[in-house]
């Protein structure tokens, strides 16, 4: 009995010695996630422009200086969170979103300037900036309160062919109106000139006076 108890105790010690490195690694990786928080600030409201582009700044603060950072943009719709885009970059290099052309950004010190493109009215919602400081340890993670992005779809432009038809109709109407006014004006001018002359020259005989005086010669006799 003593021998069997000693064997079981030895097996437990051997199992503990084998699993201790894994337990220590687990503790080093996951305990800092919950113990090292980070504040992330972002604007409360942003209005996208007419082309569906919205820009906002994510500013994070931490005690250490990170060399490798990961930025993730999340969209909250009700109780669900969906990832819009994400990128991992080093402080020395430029922030680039390789897998998604929806987002672009630049980084300066502890600020990340994010731009989201191709937004429509249905994309209006709360966009949350998540920042992770990956290297060097310890691991920091923080999420902002979110930026409410409002998107207004621009009114559709009218068809260019339709505009051409309208322009042609208006031009034709103006031309017909000017032609009608010109014709009426010429007609009135001709009517005014008709009582003055018929346009045909007729040679008329000279007229004699109705009453022509007759003069008798008057002679004075000379003796």
UniProtKB/Swiss-Prot annotation:
Glycan attachment positions: 113, 145
Region of interest (Important for interaction with CD80 and CD86), ranges: 134-139
Disulfide bond found in the keyword field: yes
Highest taxon of source: Eukaryota
Segments forming domain Ig-like V-type: 39-140
Subunit details: Homodimer; disulfide-linked. Binds to CD80/B7-1 and CD86/B7.2. Interacts with ICOSLG.
Protein name: Cytotoxic T-lymphocyte protein 4
Organism (species): Sus scrofa (Pig)
């Amino acid at each position: 009995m003593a021998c069997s108890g000693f064997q079981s105790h030895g097996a437990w010690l051997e199992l503990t010695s084998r699993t201790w490195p894994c337990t220590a690694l687990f503790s080093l990786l996951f305990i800092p996630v919950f113990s090292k928080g980070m504040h992330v600030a972002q604007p409360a409201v942003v209005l996208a422009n007419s082309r569906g582009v919205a820009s906002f700044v994510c500013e994070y603060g931490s005690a250490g200086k990170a060399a490798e950072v990961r930025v993730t943009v999340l969209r909250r719709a009700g109780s669900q969170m969906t990832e819009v885009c994400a990128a991992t970059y080093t402080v020395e290099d430029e922030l680039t979103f390789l897998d998604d052309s929806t987002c672009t950004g630049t980084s300066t010190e502890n600020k990340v300037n994010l731009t989201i493109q191709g937004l429509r009215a249905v994309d209006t919602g709360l966009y949350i900036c998540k920042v992770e400081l990956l290297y060097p340890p310890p691991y920091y993670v923080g999420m902002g309160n979110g930026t409410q992005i409002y998107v207004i779809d621009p009114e559709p432009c009218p068809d260019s062919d339709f505009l051409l038809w309208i322009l042609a109709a208006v031009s034709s109407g103006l031309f017909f109106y000017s032609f009608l006014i010109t014709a009426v004006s010429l007609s009135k001018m001709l009517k005014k000139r008709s009582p003055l002359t018929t346009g045909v020259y007729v040679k008329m005989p000279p007229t004699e006076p109705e009453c022509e005086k007759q003069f008798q010669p008057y002679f004075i006799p000379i003796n």
